[in-house]
Curated annotation (Swiss-Prot):
SUPFAM superfamilies: Class II aaRS ABD-related, Class II aaRS and biotin synthetases. It catalyses: tRNA(His) + L-histidine + ATP = L-histidyl-tRNA(His) + AMP + diphosphate + H(+). It comes from Thermosipho melanesiensis (strain DSM 12029 / CIP 104789 / BI429). One of its GO terms (cellular component) is cytoplasm. This is Histidine--tRNA ligase. Belongs to the class-II aminoacyl-tRNA synthetase family.
């Protein structure tokens, strides 16, 4: 027997209502803010992610699913959604239709990580990209969209953490101070931090092993240039005026190399040590880095599996999927075709119908309808058809009535609306 690959999930049945809930909410919130959906390929050229995410990041070094295709090209299953979106923006000359460009995506991503609750090797993200604005209004909008989305899900136990990691100018001085701070600790830090000390010193602040050194490290907010400091203060001021709750975290740097300026993460209080449910920030240099014109941009992404756990932990009620409103049972050879016609009439009027396609008696058909959680059952029998009637049965209460053939659709709709 074949089994699913480790780190993947089959999503079906009761779980689907959570996926519909989160995806539908994401689409509604992005609609309110003028974002359009984009769907990019699941695999891209490997170099796209090496160039954008950063050669020394854990994602590129350890986590990417990379392979050679039959044309000997290096291909990678996308580990995140921003780089493919920006590649599509450049390749399709979206700048020609005007800026800023607001895009969102929902889809699977792939990283070779140790599977654990809410963290799979194939996982799903909802993300937005706001391309073309350097204003603090854009930074605030991204955070406001994230906050409204989470509130619309009914979540309350979350924290938005924000920081500014500055520009290349102010980061240069900060990196010097950070190197000085860690210079006498290199024999004590983890192997990853030893390597990052010379390749990307900022990534030491993202270490989950040497946390005692991280908390005492110099704060980048003390080294921001005037422009970055002004941008950070303006963004916070807008969030304050909009009553958006957030916490400043001067050690927040994010795990991808393309970020600059404002960065933020969202953590949920009921998810334990792995509490992050999303994050994002500015990436003003990424489009130029990937071959386009210098274009200020920012965005965020959230893990859908993590969001589902958060929704369940907070006990948020999620509406059942109302797929199976009516089960149509039939008895006798001559009743089959009429039962099919009745089913199609109901569907023509927007009523979902499950039609019996098995050789079963009435008792077995009713039992199957109950398993499917059908609300009503229409019983089409030869004897009833001779009298030009069918039987409509409430599957929850057992109440049933006879309906004349011409009134089936109207009466069925009334019974559905009453429930």
């Amino acid at each position: 027997m074949y089994k699913k690959i480790k780190g993947t999930d089959d999503i079906y049945g009761e779980d689907m209502k959570y996926w519909y809930f989160i995806e539908n909410t994401a689409r509604e919130i992005t609609r309110l803010y003028g974002y359009s959906e984009i769907r990019t390929p699941i695999f891209e050229q490997t170099e796209l992610f090496v160039r954008s995410v950063g050669e020394e990041t854990d994602i590129v070094q350890k986590e990417m699913y990379t392979f050679k295709d039959k044309g000997d090209r290096s291909i990678t299953l996308r580990p995140e959604g921003t780089a493919p979106t920006i590649r599509a923006f450049i390749e399709n000359s979206m700048v020609a239709t005007g800026l800023p460009k607001r895009l969102f995506y929902i889809g699977p991503m792939f990283r070779y990580e140790r599977p654990q609750a809410g963290r799979q090797r194939q996982f799903h993200q909802f993300g937005i990209e706001l391309i073309g604005s350097s204003s603090s209004l854009a930074d605030a909008e991204a955070i406001v969209v994230a906050d409204r989305f989470l509130k619309s899900l009914g979540l309350v136990d979350y924290t938005i953490k924000i920081n500014s990691i500055g520009c290349e100018k102010c980061r240069a001085e900060y990196k010097k101070k950070l190197k000085e701070y860690y210079s006498d600790k290199l024999d004590k830090v983890c192997d990853d931090c030893k390597r990052r000390y010379n390749t990307n010193i900022l990534r030491l602040l993202d270490c989950k092993v040497d946390v005692e050194y991280v908390k005492d490290a110099p704060k980048i907010t003390d080294y921001l240039c005037d422009n970055c400091k002004k941008h950070y203060e303006e963004t916070k001021n807008i969030l304050d005026k909009l009553d958006i709750n957030y916490e400043e975290d001067p050690l927040l740097v994010r795990g991808l190399d393309y970020y600059n300026g404002i960065v933020f993460e969202i953590h949920h209080g009921k998810l334990g040590a792995q509490s992050a449910i999303g994050g994002g920030g500015r990436y003003d240099n990424l489009i130029k880095e990937l071959g386009g014109q210098q274009t200020p941009s920012l965005g965020f992404a959230m893990g859908i599996e993590r969001l589902i756990i958060a929704v369940k932990k907070e006990g948020i009620p999620v509406e059942e999927i109302k797929n199976n409103e009516v089960f149509v049972a039939h008895l006798g050879e001559s009743a089959r075709i009429e039962a099919i016609k009745i089913s199609e009439e109901l569907r023509d009027n927007g009523i979902s119908v499950v039609f019996n396609t098995m050789e079963r008696g009435l008792s077995a058909q009713l039992k199957h309808a109950s398993r499917l959680n059908c609300r009503l059952c229409l019983i089409v029998g030869e004897n009833e058809l001779e009298r030009n009637v069918v039987i409509l049965r409430n599957m929850k209460t057992g109440e049933q009535i006879e309906i004349e053939r011409d009134y089936i659709v109207g009466t069925t709709r009334e019974w559905i609306d009453e429930q």
